[in-house]
């Protein structure tokens, strides 16, 4: 993958993770057409998805897509699909839905991607329908190159609304004035209320140190200490020199 494309994919995934709460490992729903295409072109589907999303993935397939693969009797594609986790779609085995209808019913729940699926499909009509659902990353294979589609209009609009709500949350809230007047009920003042500033203390480095004033008791103690020190001092004794010569040339008697 080229560096420019990888950087673009990282930006898109950041939007999906911040706005729509996508988390690793990403759950990727694949359809029968993509499995057949990967099997025919010898494309490693799990590693391709991991390389495109730049994270760990959990590849999943619905029961209706498996039923569609059984009808093709392509053993290679069937064995490849059996390696993936089976996603229950709650559709009957006897009367399965088409893969496109099945995936759309699993992903689009009341107009939202509730389970945060990444859809990898070769069905153009299915991808067109899922672009109207906010927060659905779409992946397809083009000439043996796995491509993730740019952010859809619905996803970009939902992301913009979410960011604006985060930015202006609380500023336009009508209950803010009431909270400022009455408080929040617990005795605490509102967060937006300004804190009163008192007089500033002087710079401790520019203030002169106070002179220590000795009390009479301290002076008496100092005098006692000095007198004790004087008493403890010893007087050095000088030894007399017995070998001092006398004027007549004899030494003094010891």
Swiss-Prot record:
Broad class of where this protein is predominantly found: mitochondrion
Bias (Basic and acidic residues) ranges: 175-192, 218-228
One annotated GO molecular function: small ribosomal subunit rRNA binding
A Pfam family matched in the record: Fcf1
Phosphoserine modified-residue sites: 182
Biological process, per Gene Ontology: endonucleolytic cleavage in 5'-ETS of tricistronic rRNA transcript (SSU-rRNA, 5.8S rRNA, LSU-rRNA); endonucleolytic cleavage in ITS1 to separate SSU-rRNA from 5.8S rRNA and LSU-rRNA from tricistronic rRNA transcript (SSU-rRNA, 5.8S rRNA, LSU-rRNA); endonucleolytic cleavage to generate mature 5'-end of SSU-rRNA from (SSU-rRNA, 5.8S rRNA, LSU-rRNA); maturation of SSU-rRNA; maturation of SSU-rRNA from tricistronic rRNA transcript (SSU-rRNA, 5.8S rRNA, LSU-rRNA)
Subcellular location: Mitochondrion; Nucleus, Nucleolus
Stretches for region Disordered: 172-254
GO cellular component terms, semicolon-separated: mitochondrion; nucleolus; nucleoplasm; small-subunit processome
Residue ranges, compositional bias (Basic residues): 229-240
Keywords attached to this entry: Mitochondrion, Nucleus, Phosphoprotein, Ribosome biogenesis, RNA-binding, rRNA processing
Bias-annotated ranges (Polar residues): 241-254
Family: Belongs to the UTP23/FCF1 family. UTP23 subfamily.
Miscellaneous comment in the UniProt entry for this protein: Present with 6960 molecules/cell in log phase SD medium.
Known function: Involved in rRNA-processing and ribosome biogenesis.
PANTHER family: RRNA-PROCESSING PROTEIN UTP23 HOMOLOG
The protein's name: rRNA-processing protein UTP23
């Amino acid at each position: 993958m080229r560096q420019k494309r990888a950087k673009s994919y990282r930006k898109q995934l950041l939007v999906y993770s911040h706005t729509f709460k996508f988390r690793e490992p990403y759950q990727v729903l694949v359809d029968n057409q993509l499995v057949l295409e990967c099997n025919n072109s010898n494309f490693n589907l799990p590693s391709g998805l991991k390389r495109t999303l730049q994270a760990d993935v959990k590849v999943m397939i619905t029961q209706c897509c498996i039923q569609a693969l059984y009808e093709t009797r392509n053993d290679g594609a069937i064995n490849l699909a059996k390696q993936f986790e089976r996603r229950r779609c709650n559709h009957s085995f006897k009367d399965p839905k088409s893969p496109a209808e099945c995936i759309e019913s699993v992903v689009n729940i009341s107009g939202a991607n509730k389970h945060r699926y990444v859809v990898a499909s070769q069905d153009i009509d299915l991808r067109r329908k899922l672009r109207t659902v906010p927060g659905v990353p779409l992946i397809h294979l083009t000439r043996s190159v796995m491509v993730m589609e740019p952010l859809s209009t619905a996803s970009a609009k939902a992301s913009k609304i979410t960011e604006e709500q985060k930015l202006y949350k609380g500023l336009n809230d009508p209950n803010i004035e009431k909270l400022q007047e009455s408080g929040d009920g617990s005795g605490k003042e509102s967060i937006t209320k300004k804190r009163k500033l008192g007089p500033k203390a002087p710079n401790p480095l520019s203030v002169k140190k106070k002179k220590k004033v000795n009390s009479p008791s301290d002076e008496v103690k100092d005098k006692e200490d000095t007198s004790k020190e004087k008493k403890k001092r010893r007087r050095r004794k000088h030894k007399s020199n017995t070998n001092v010569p006398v004027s007549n040339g004899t030494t003094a008697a010891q």
